[in-house]
Every structure is written in C-alpha cells, then in structure tokens.
Curated annotation (Swiss-Prot):
Species this chain originates from: Cronobacter sakazakii (strain ATCC BAA-894) (Enterobacter sakazakii)
Active-site residues, Swiss-Prot/TrEMBL: D150 (proton donor/acceptor)
BP GO terms, sorted: acetate metabolic process; acetyl-CoA biosynthetic process
UniProt enzyme class: transferase
UniProt-listed HAMAP family: Acetate_kinase
Enzyme Commission numbers on file: 2.7.2.1
UniProt KW keywords: ATP-binding, Cytoplasm, Kinase, Magnesium, Metal-binding, Nucleotide-binding, Transferase
Site annotation Transition state stabilizer: residues: H182, R243
Name under which the protein is recorded: Acetate kinase
Amino acid sequence: MSSKLVLVLNCGSSSLKFAIIDALNGDEYLSGLAECFHLPEARIKWKMDGGKHEAALGAGAAHSEALNFIVNTILAQKPELSAQLTAIGHRIVHGGEKYTSSVVIDETVIQGIKDSASFAPLHNPAHLIGIAEALKSFPHLADKNVAVFDTAFHQTMPEESYLYALPYKLYKEHGIRRYGAHGTSHFYVTQEAAKMLNKPVEEVNIITCHLGNGGSVSAIRNGKCVDTSMGLTPLEGLVMGTRSGDIDPAIVFHLHDALGMSVDDINKLLTKESGLLGLTEVTSDCRYVEDNYATKEDAKRAMDVYCHRLAKYIGSYTALMEGRLDAVVFTGGIGENAAMVRELSLGKLGVLGFEVDHERNLAARFGKSGFINKEGTTLAMVIPTNEELVIAQDACRLTA
C-alpha cells in the first residue's frame, strides 16, 4: 500500500459514491454507494478486501450520516487506510467559466461552486454538503480537499461551439452558453485512446461517446475538446435514460399554452420522464431496450431513436476533425456494454468508412477494452472509463 491514497467523493442529491484509490497505480481499496437519502430505506453498500457489504443508514439519513458511517464504521475496521489518506477529491458537476482545471478547495472555490449552482441545481448544492462534511470528518486534511470539475475539460471549446444564437448580453451578463459535462470521463478516455493509437495526445483527433443514464459526445481535435453535446445544463444533446436531449424549444411553449403545464411540470417531463423512459413508457434501462429490440415495438422505437441521434452527432462532429478522424471511442455503462447500440449507430455511418466486426464488438464488453471495427475500416474502440482515478490523480498532484 503506497502513501498516495485518496478518498474520492461523488455527492449527488440523493446518493454518495465513494472510493479509496491509490493515485499511483490505480488500486482500489474501498468502493461503495450510499443511496436513497431522505427516505426510510436509506442504505449504504460497499466493497472492501474482496467482500461485499450492506447496511441500513436509518430512516431519513443523508450525506452527513453516510460520511459518518464511512469514517466511524467502515474505516474503523481498517485504521491503516485512514492513516494513509493524503487527500480528498470531490467530483463537481459544474464549475462555470471560472474553472478550467482542478483546484484545491478554499473559501473562494466554495463560493465559485455556489455561483454555478443555478446551472446544476441538483448537483452543486449536494457537492457543497459533501465538502462541508468531509472537512468535518477529516479535519487534518482541511487543506487537502480538491475540486475536480466535469466542465473543465470542455473549456477549450472555441466561441463558435459554446455560444448560443441568443442576444449576446445573455452570455456576457448571465453566463448562458454551452458548458458540457462528463469532462473527466472524456479526458480519461482521450488519454487512453492516444496510448491505443500509439500517438501523442496532442496529435489525436477522436470523437468520444460517454453513454450512460446520462450521455454526451465530444469532438476532440489535437487532444483538446472543440465541441460537446451537452449544453448550459446536462439536458441538451443525446437521448438519455430519462432526459429528452435535443428538442424544438417551442415544444416548451406548446406544452404550456396548449396543455396548461407549468414550468416545473415541463422541467420534470424533460428531465425525468423523457428519453428511453418516455419512448418505451416502461423503463429508462437500456438493457430492456437491447434485450427486447427484436420482439417489442416500444424497445425497437426507443433504440432506433437513440441510435439515430447518436449517429447524427458522430457524423456532424466528423466535420470538425479538419480532414482526419483517428477513431470513435465508446465509454460509460451503455457505451462499454451495449454492443447493439454501437453496431446500430456505426451501421448508419458507412459513408464515413465505419464497419463493425460483430465478434470483436461482442468481445469488448464487461470491462474489456478493444477495437470493434473490421480490419481496414475506420477505427472504433471501447475504453472503460475511470473517472475516480482521474479525480484521485488530480487530488494527489495538487496536494503533494
């Protein structure tokens, strides 16, 4: 066990993901999820020393109770882990324009996260709770807490990519622009893709597809992000588990005027009741859609719309590659495991030279990386993401 252990925290509105990772070699000593906050069934699950464990946190428990359990119950069994913690890394969904890289957390950074909360109202307030609780639980690491922003990797986008065609003062005065998300994942797979392509990162031209319950595509030119599908918020872009992605903005007015829906109703519809859930009217789970594609109309409908949208983004981002696309990369829970999504999406892009090898595609699942294209065709690859490792490495580097 090295002396570069980092506690990685990812606080959501109703959950907390945590891990202790060796920032030098990526070894994971603890990982877990506390979930169902504020509900009677609040619970925590974790993996340590090869064993799986679960416990109730108590009715109504939230971030404070979860971190208390991690410190006083889980880590109490392994005091050597606590003793060797050198830093705490926090995933922060939105850093606005202010943060282009990870930073050590101080009062100014906390204020910056608050200032960006209107763009991530479910996530940023939860991150602030996580930071406050971590400072309480680990006072000896007070100056070793690091914020790693999901938006930072996308701050290299040029103005023509991040501006909306709205009155310019809305950007200048209120920061309304494209920010993107999943930046930590897009960054990680870009680094890994460069290794697989045997190229320096700064020479890599790829399109990265992070597909999970949320999903986004990024255009990476010369190793830097030049466009991404998520926008001001994570609602824009691809079809997602429960999010609509791109729609005609006038649908919002129609829902209000013709159906009498309130702003809150429409927000809930677009963020929690749309996407795969809306199209199937049954579930947001891509596994259902894949398993039932050949036999159920709802599954086929959802999969076809999902892959059509994804193929459109890959195709359009090819135009930003300045004449050379090295590869398309799939990552995230769906990107890494849903072979059908990859095959159907790339099957629409034969004009760009894509041809999926069925056997290679099936082999690149369940944590395995690899190329999935037929020999001699445009490269496509699967790379399992590791956002926690990036967060641990940044936290270690900035607090050394």
